[in-house]
């Protein structure tokens, strides 16, 4: 990288962060009343600090509404909330329980009705947060969770989608989520040792018992999706998808469109990279999931800053923030896409919730697509072990 390019990288990242903070601060002031629950308890600290004074029985009141989209036949808010970061996935350890319960309720107040968690997040802790937070409004929200990993001594182990394990996982999730049914149950990762047809039959039985309403797959290949759908119609498929990872467009999107299946992208802001939250010289703590991801290694990170600069330029053009632009771009790809950005901070929640209001025209999308095709990206999206769990059949 030339000195000039390095200087441009160094200058642009703080500028993006300043702009993001400025816009978020404005949103926080304008929506200050939204931080209060119906009882007057603080829902989440706008400065992003954990709070512990919000009573767990506070009933949230929905003050904002988002447009809705359909995942198959399941109607949800046009954006969901991913609840993985709350357990310390990106470092810092699990967040304060009351603060996260408050944050989830604040998301509902912002119009979000679609919440994504998993048995293995924590493990179990994320489901507990979601269950406690949404119990007062259970009939007004859609809760998605996942099975597919063994959990021993509080730690995830190997892939496990055996029928008996699925049933045990679902019973545990129902208890932690404080509900009698799961709206959307995903297989977290396809298990090469269990035919997907056996998995589908097991979930079909759970649906017949009323414990599950819809089902989906995560990081599944087009072939696996078709096999699963032939046994039990699939409602949604989840995968990583963002400006820097567009592989699902090649084989997954055509399959989903043909079969009428929705798509739920996780990490739609590239693990906060497109939010301007990462700088070229940043080094990640060993507790931060990004510390061993190829695209976040020093050399790759520095070279990939050109993508952030691109998002920043478009954010200025659209009078929005880079993260809102990134989310709006994801949503503009198909009408059956519902991203689930995660956060642990109220200002970021407010910022994310504004993305559905950002409109990109067809001509703008073509212009963006042409530009992205010319941006070289360095490093894979996952470490070798995680990569081995993705279904590529």
Language-model features: locations:
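N-terminal secretory signal peptides
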Residues: 1-17
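N-terminal twin-arginine translocation
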Residues: 15-21, 31-52
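Terminal-tail/helix-coil boundary detector
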Residues: 22-23, 45-66, 258, 286-313, ...
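Conserved, mostly hydrophobic/aromatic
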Residues: 71, 81, 115, 130, ...
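N-terminal small/glycine-rich loop or linker at the start of catalytic domains
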Residues: 72-90, 144-157
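Glycine-rich, proline-tolerant flexible connector loops at the mouths of alpha/beta enzymes
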Residues: 117-132
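Glycine/proline-rich, positively charged
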Residues: 152-247, 251, 261-262
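Aromatic-lined glycan-binding groove of carbohydrate-active enzymes
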Residues: 248-283
